[in-house]
Amino acid sequence: KKLFLDTDIIFQDTSTEGTIKLSTVGFNLINKIKMTNDKIFFSSNNDLGSRLFYKGQINLKPFNFLLDIKANEIDLTNLISNESFFMEVLKSRLFFNKNLNFNISLYSNRINQKNFNNLVLKSKFDQESLNLFGTRINLRDFAVLNLSNNQLLINKDNLFLNGEVEIIIENKDKFFSFFLVPKKLRKNLKVISIKYKYNLESSIFEIDNIEIDKKTIQDFNFLTKDINNLKGFKTNKIQLRKILNKLLESYDG
């Protein structure tokens, strides 16, 4: 496919502004831009319809990049699977550069995986440290997965994502039904907190700590085999159901 570029730029004494249009068969991308001495502002316009909207700002002195993206629908597999472009960029170590400084936020109400919706993903890179903060996604209409204190680290040439995920249960009856939890194990749960380490190279999870309603599970070695069998973001519902039921069997709350 041929790619066409069309520009409409007005140069002024203190600023430059206009549009840059990229087009190919069945697709147009129109950027509105404005440049001053030390800032560049850019955004999409309504020609993209409701599928995608973005706006951003580049500060030149000192350098800082800000970007907000709102998408009508997100393919979660293409975003976080081990073979995705996003994950390949993370593995490339490009973010570990002291000259980079950025904040990127991604929002989408619809996810193409039927069990998830309302994604908010926020990332911040500063001083050679990549952090995911304020990131959350809904599990249907009965739970929220909230990621906090998540940081991308390099250790002995391996790339790790360290952090904590909170499973906030908003409707325990629907939650238990979804995971087919036996009635004898259905307890009055509100929050399950898991501190973890995820190796992006080998797709292996390690669990450092588990809490249920702020009560620490002292010994979860009985879950080690099941946790080691997790295949990163390709983990399926059956594997998670097995781990959850074993965890609830050990919980005396």
Predicted region positions:
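Membrane-proximal interfacial segments on either side of biological membranes
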Residues: K1-G253
